[in-house]
């Protein structure tokens, strides 16, 4: 699959983030001509700078809400493929900054789709959203792509809106098939290089660095955790397939098998195990905390039936690879080499 991307012009929004940095590394390794458009890296430290991703691509620092700069950068790049990852991605932050969250996640989607609409170079567009776009009914079954879109909190709801914007543009402006448009609704991702606040694995890594207990807010919440490489390669698979044949342009869930949908407490137990048991975790549930879903799974039958896709790593391996990368970073090792190694191992594996 990666041979397809050699020489392809790819425009990635949100390239300085955790997922964006991994994605740009994969594309650069494949020989793609990558232009990234994003705000400055969202954390300090951050994977984008640690792994010197800027040296692999053309990086433009800009706000997805700034249409003029976005359009200028887009027109200069003349992309064939657009992968839209730029977002305000933290649920808890969306309660603090609801207007900013909607501006970024909804109008940001409008802006990038306007760039696509006003161009004649793009053949494939993929909007990356989230498993949280669905109306959460707190049931045990995985949500399918035809379930109602109605995220509860400002982050989740803004991503539901982003889906609807994409659907509208697809129907209104691209019904002639000149651009293949899809969305990908991915489950929770983990992996080396995530330094975000209010995410459980980065919290674990920080606790390991400091030799402190891990604070867990919602140990009984179930999430579709997967290694970051799982959805990234799914995105690239979808973008390639619809580039070659528009019949693949659709809406897809991307998540782990049901056996790998674990509680946050079980995930932290795995982290402690692969960290050689050198840390512990404590439950500090907050009764008056902001609303977050307790039970969330995805049904990924569609992705499997259409593409023959299956996950490469179980959640145990995903956590093990995360700890491996984190140790490399903490011991001041070569994190770029570690990323390349894990990408190669991922491509060589299949559950």
Regions found by a protein language model. Name each.
Residues 43-44, 134, 190, 260, ...:
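Flexible, glycine-rich phosphate/dinucleotide-binding loops
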Residues 5, 15-17, 82, 169, ...:
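Generic structural signal for small/hydrophobic residues in well-ordered secondary structure
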Residues 1-186, 329, 346:
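N-terminal Rossmann-like NAD(P)+-binding domain of SDR-like oxidoreductases, especially those catalyzing
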Residues 28-30, 62, 208-351:
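C-terminal substrate-binding subdomain of Rossmann-fold SDR/epimerase-dehydratase oxidoreductases
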Residues 137-142, 146, 154-155, 160-243, ...:
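NAD(P)-dependent short-chain dehydrogenase/reductase
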Residues 71, 114, 202, 269, ...:
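Active-site phosphate/pyrophosphate- and oxyanion-stabilizing loops and adjacent acidic/basic residues
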Residues 67-68, 80, 92, 99, ...:
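Residues in well-ordered alpha-helical elements
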């Amino acid at each position: 699959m990666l041979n397809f991307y050699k020489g392809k012009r790819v425009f990635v929004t949100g390239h300085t983030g955790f997922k964006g940095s991994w994605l740009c590394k994969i594309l650069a390794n494949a020989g793609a001509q990558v232009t990234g458009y994003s705000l400055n890296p969202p954390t300090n430290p951050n994977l984008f700078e640690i792994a010197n991703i800027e040296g692999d691509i053309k990086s433009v620092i800009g706000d997805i809400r700034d249409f003029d700069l976005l359009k200028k950068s887009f027109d200069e790049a003349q992309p064939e493929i657009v992968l839209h990852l730029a977002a305000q991605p933290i649920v808890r932050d969306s309660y603090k900054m609801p207007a900013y969250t909607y501006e970024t996640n909804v109008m940001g989607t409008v802006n990038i789709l306007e760039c696509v609409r006003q161009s004649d170079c793009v053949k494939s567009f993929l909007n990356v959203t989230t498993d949280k776009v669905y109306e959460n009914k707190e049931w045990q079954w995985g949500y399918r792509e035809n379930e109602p879109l109605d995220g509860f909190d400002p982050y989740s709801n803004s991503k539901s809106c982003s889906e609807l914007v994409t659907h509208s543009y697809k129907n209104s402006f691209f019904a002639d098939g000149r651009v293949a448009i899809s969305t990908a609704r991915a489950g929770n991702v983990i992996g080396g290089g995530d330094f975000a606040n209010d995410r459980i694995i980065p919290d674990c890594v920080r606790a390991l660095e400091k030799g402190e207990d891990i604070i867990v807010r919602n140990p009984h919440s179930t999430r579709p955790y997967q290694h970051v490489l799982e959805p990234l390669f799914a995105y690239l698979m979808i973008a390639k397939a619809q580039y070659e044949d528009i019949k693949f342009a659709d809406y897809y869930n991307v998540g782990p098998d049901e056996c790998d949908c674990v509680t946050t407490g079980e995930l932290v137990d795995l982290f402690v195990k692969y960290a050689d048991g050198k840390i512990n975790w404590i439950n500090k549930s907050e009764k008056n905390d902001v609303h977050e879903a307790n039970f969330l799974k995805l049904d990924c039958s569609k992705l499997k039936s259409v593409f023959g896709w299956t996950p490469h790593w179980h959640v145990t391996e995903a956590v093990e690879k995360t700890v491996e990368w984190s140790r490399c970073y903490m011991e001041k090792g070569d994190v770029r080499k570690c990323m390349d190694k894990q990408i190669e191992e991922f491509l060589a594996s299949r559950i």
